[in-house]
């Protein structure tokens, strides 16, 4: 065995062994329990970052642990390789997205291999290949045939100068990123999938996701947003028109003083024909963004339409206002405004001098709405026949009256909107729909799939090549001329079913149901919580679509979900001569000074610039505080990086990158190597014989098996990898202090090292692989079994008993593990410290808690 730990040499040899022996390639085996471990696949941006490393290390730890449990473990990897960044890179580098993407895949693939992740590379997929997106296109046509796909107009960001659609990321301060032209909102036809048809099931089945974090489940419940309310019809005074409004608070209906409608509402557009101020307001709203997040914080503005709504119960007329906080594509595009009981309505009414009336008051007092709306549920008053009713009774009475008079209906609504899957970009899967010469829109026939995306293109940064090339769109279907759809799929489409394709990645069909149903559902899924409401919801939705197509037989795609925290690093900058911030990499910081609490108070970079320290923040390009994993692997080895990632923080919490911590992890591995090296050079011919052990030897062996029990629970059930590592470190401390003078001493250390290398194998697999062989094991560690606790070793010969006199600890005594109360009491009473504190007192009571405590009460 080499005396010195040499990570680069060891890791290269072990990785070659895994590659040559196809160690992690698996097939279905009905005789073995399966375990499917999956980390969210990466976008091939060019280089791995530490967030990737943390995600994939967690996944690899889980997969390797389950493998040593004897399970048939699938851990695949692939590339989420369509998307806008490739287009931007292609424009900047004067190339096409395809070669840029494929080069990045090769580079990042090598980085993943250097980190020693145990992937089944035979199942590798890239979503930008026709072999993958062909089946996505096929499935979309099947959804269309089932009535789950439709086309309607929807708003997009439009640059009038370039005459092109912009992604949200390409709109900067309301202007086009390329030409600085003010961006407009434009209505264009787009494709949608009816996720709302599954809203109830998606909501109800959240309750079955026992292995998912509560935070993610709450976020999904809120995103789906089920509400029970009433949809009612308001007439329009002086017009033969009406419009609908949905509310979850019909109990406040008698307090409506105005109605707010979206700028795009048909009534607003009618009124604008004779109202120039309103027409200008509508144009302004059309050109502003309409995300819910922005609506919540922007100034609430409106214009009176001159129209009046007729209250469905009182017949009273209330003004109709066009308002910028009402969206046409959300609900009915109109809201009843009750400023006495809704704060947004209150502020709007105050701003424009509209009436404010109170119709709800607390059960036990009066209501004051002079400064703010009263938004709690309470008792109705100023509400005519409904006075005195509480929320529930008021809700039902008003709903029943509206239903009886044909002016309303009870309704369950969802916040969830249908999924708009059209993107006016190039680098995505073409949407497989065609328009015939007579205007009929039909799916591309199956025998014409895949609709290939041309990869040999020139990006001009203005228009998608498949939109610019009029010839590309031309095709024929059943002998008729037709035009292809030139929009491409939202890239969330690819990531919604990739997990299932891994089960049969080379099948000449979307999924091989037998293989898919062997592996699915995923047993452990790992990824960031930022995906809770988009990817993870589409992921669940797609699984139900696959189920209803007869391709899978489970209801949910993943049993357990672990959402790992972000990786943070120190961030530094200086102000240059132009007054701009220049962010400096932590690796380029030459010296730092710290206060007595370890906080950085001064920092200077390699060029002598005095730096401003802004604290720990998420590793990012913008702050130049990302640490290249490859640099760390070359310096310390992959095992060290992996160990630090697992030890520095619980997996769900943020991890603070500290190179001092990396150095500590490296020192620990060297200590383990040194201990193993010393052991293999001892005479280890004597086999362990538990009957021959001294009490000290038994105590050490007890620590070994307590550690096995703890690490097994920490990794397998609790997924607290940091405490698992801490437990092994503590055991190592015991071993380093233990004597190595007798055959049984060496036998116990041999047993301990055999356990440690398997306990640490999921985390530091290269060094564990090597040490396992050096310890004299004939087979490789991948073929071994996880260490098993010897229950007999945990049995203690003696117990430490705390002795209290009148509630205060006065002594600690060691007794035989099977000692009875009388012998413990006799030993306790004879202790010199106890005798001292009982002097002059009469013992009134003695309480013995077996194995723990002897309590003496005396006065």
UniProtKB/Swiss-Prot annotation:
Write the Enzyme Commission number(s) for this entry: 6.1.1.4
Q: What is its main location?
A: cytoplasm
Recorded hits in InterPro entries, A to Z, give: aa-tRNA-synth_I_CS, aa-tRNA-synth_Ia, Leu-tRNA-ligase, Leu_tRNA-synth_edit, M/V/L/I-tRNA-synth_anticd-bd, Methionyl/Leucyl_tRNA_Synth, Rossmann-like_a/b/a_fold, tRNAsynth_Ia_anticodon-bd
One GO molecular-function annotation for this sequence? leucine-tRNA ligase activity
Q: Which gene encodes it?
A: leuS
* UniProt keyword Cell division, yes or no: no
Organism of derivation: Shewanella baltica (strain OS195)
Name the CDD domains for this protein: Anticodon_Ia_Leu_BEm, LeuRS_core
Q: Enumerate the UniProt keywords alphabetically.
A: Aminoacyl-tRNA synthetase, ATP-binding, Cytoplasm, Ligase, Nucleotide-binding, Protein biosynthesis
Family to which this protein belongs: Belongs to the class-I aminoacyl-tRNA synthetase family.
Q: Where is this motif: 'KMSKS' region?
A: 618-622
Binding, ATP: 621
Where is this protein localized, as stated in its record?
Cytoplasm
Give the matching Pfam families.
Answer: Anticodon_1, tRNA-synt_1, tRNA-synt_1_2, tRNA-synt_1g
For this entry, list what GO says about its biological process: leucyl-tRNA aminoacylation
Task: Specify the protein name.
Answer: Leucine--tRNA ligase
Where does this chain carry the motif 'HIGH' region? 42-52
SUPFAM superfamilies registered for this protein in UniProt: Anticodon-binding domain of a subclass of class I aminoacyl-tRNA synthetases, Nucleotidylyl transferase, ValRS/IleRS/LeuRS editing domain
- Tell me which GO cellular component terms the UniProt record holds: cytosol
> Could you tell me what reaction this enzyme catalyses?
tRNA(Leu) + L-leucine + ATP = L-leucyl-tRNA(Leu) + AMP + diphosphate
